[in-house]
């Protein structure tokens, strides 16, 4: 049994894969397994993985014949993992050589800890920028969940095996599955701590979260999936209220995305995106939202009339544009 299993979903990553794998094989904590799931890559990624696996038995390669996306790929790796703890590393990212050891030390010294965060450096070309979080030693699960809703704390960590098996990656939310599982891991952790190991997170302007495409509206679908999972867990009304406010703000945020970028999207994408916004708007439980928020222009639900709601949003974002205030936050 490995101490830590590292899940690496791989799709056409030949450009970055060597750096990623070398950083994992160089870990000062030797008892790890590296489970690389090749998600039907069309480049030389599989050949690279097989070559590394021949040199080091800690690397296990799973090859998927069809491209299934990162959530299903990671879950395929999770199912065959043996580690006491589970981490993920994207195939274009890498770890400091002591990252796993630092995380394991925290688990060893604090047995109530279920999740240990890495330090994160966002990599822009040759420039590294620290992800700044509020200073903390320990967070309870609820606080970590709440802080993750606005990403005051990030979602890059090592988690106890039992918790990850209970909450695998959300396969219903293709583009944002990691956000949902992160929040479920935090919410169900007894203690969340941080270590000094570093995760280097390469930033790409062409990623789903940066480009203008229909996939951006998937965020609302992921939010709906998250709400359903919270309800299935019978969480408190306090948690549901907090998350419903997040969902509502994201509905407004995605309408702003629609407002700003509709000239860049084809007609079919616009119709589909607007339909997703409408379904989310219809499903909002207004009674869970803060009264001051639903009285604020731009955020009034107008549940009885989609037309009136749209008129409000068009006016709201037109006025914001005149004032230079339309800045995307998703």
Stretches with model-predicted labels:
Residues 2-7, 25-36, 44, 56-60:
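Short loop->beta transition adjacent to catalytic acidic/histidine clusters or analogous donor-positioning motifs
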Residues 141-219:
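Conserved nucleotide-sugar donor-binding catalytic segment
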Residues 12-26:
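Short, well-formed alpha-helical segments that are part of the catalytic scaffolds
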Residues 64-81, 88:
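Glycine-rich, basic loop-to-helix element that forms the pyrophosphate-binding segment
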Residues 96-168:
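Flexible acidic/His/Gly-enriched loops in nucleotide-sugar-dependent glycosyltransferase catalytic domains
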